[in-house]
Amino acid sequence: MILGTRGSALAIAQADLVTKMLEEKGHELTRNVIKTSGDVFTDRPLHEVAGVGVFVRELDDRMIEGEVDIAVHSMKDLPTVRPPELAIAAVLKRDSPYDVLLTADGSTLDELPDGAIIGTTSMRRRAQLLRYRPDLNVEDLRGNINTRIQKLKAGQYDGILLAEAGLQRMGWDMDVQRLPAEAFCPSANQGTIVVVTRADDEAERACSVLNHERSRMETEVERLLITDVEGGCIVPIGSFAQMNEDGDEIHVLVEVLAVDGTREIRIEDDIPVKNYREHALSIGRMLVEMGGKELVQEAVCEMSGCDDE
């Protein structure tokens, strides 16, 4: 089987993990490294790279064309609407879903001075950061995880926001501050690796044994919560679901923010595992009724520079 992956250090680390798991099951794999739009256009913010799925589209196309059999992704990059020819064969056990702050001098978010420069590649993190500390200067930060950290060390930023899972997968033990989900609700599926194959394919059957059912349920809930507001992973939307220890309820938190963090529409609730899909979709509809879709459209318009008429 041919496994397709992006070429960044983090993507390769994730592909290595899946390769090892499949080889332990007796499967033989070769690798095809593919550049995506998100990798090529690193000189501009993500929202300026056309459309959603900027890290996924090319791999989807290669798989549909039969050039690769398996693709490994950070699940947060996977668009909500997927090609019908493709299947989510496995959701791996989730790593940390949280954001972390890495600063040049070890300062926490509350300790940073007024006007400190914070770098992030995410409009969600930007909006949440400005909501929490409107005095900070938040600037765009592109590049792979190594490049971002080098820019911090070079003094271009006082701090940077990253996904904790990325640091963990790289095997880096750094002095970071984990940011609470209550203030920094993660992107849907953050910290989760997903394995995609063609539907009803031999590769799907081979990869299905890697599936972690609890993680699959939590990530499905997070995607259902934001299905109706749309917008993709580039707009300021957070969606987080976490099953309790008894396994009978899922705590959910979903929010849509204005780009500058001054407004939010937010719902937090506990839903029963029984009929969880219906409950998650109901909360998603409620988010729309409260004005969530309009706030998403406003954010998209602001980021794309369209005029109000």
Swiss-Prot record:
CC cofactor: dipyrromethane
Signal peptide: none
One Pfam family, short name: Porphobil_deamC
Gene3D superfamilies found in the cross-reference section: Periplasmic binding protein-like II (3.40.190.10), Porphobilinogen deaminase, C-terminal domain (3.30.160.40)
Family that this chain belongs to: Belongs to the HMBS family.
The protein's annotated pathway: Porphyrin-containing compound metabolism; protoporphyrin-IX biosynthesis; coproporphyrinogen-III from 5-aminolevulinate: step 2/4
Note on how the cofactor is bound: Binds 1 dipyrromethane group covalently.
Species annotation: Methanococcoides burtonii (strain DSM 6242 / NBRC 107633 / OCM 468 / ACE-M)
Positions carrying S-(dipyrrolylmethanemethyl)cysteine: C233
InterPro entries recorded: HemC (IPR000860), Porphobilin_deaminase_cofac_BS (IPR022419), Porphobilin_deaminase_N (IPR022417), Porphobilinogen_deaminase_C (IPR022418), Porphobilinogen_deaminase_C_sf (IPR036803)
Name by which UniProt lists this protein: Probable porphobilinogen deaminase
Gene: hemC
Catalyzed reactions: 4 porphobilinogen + H2O = hydroxymethylbilane + 4 NH4(+)
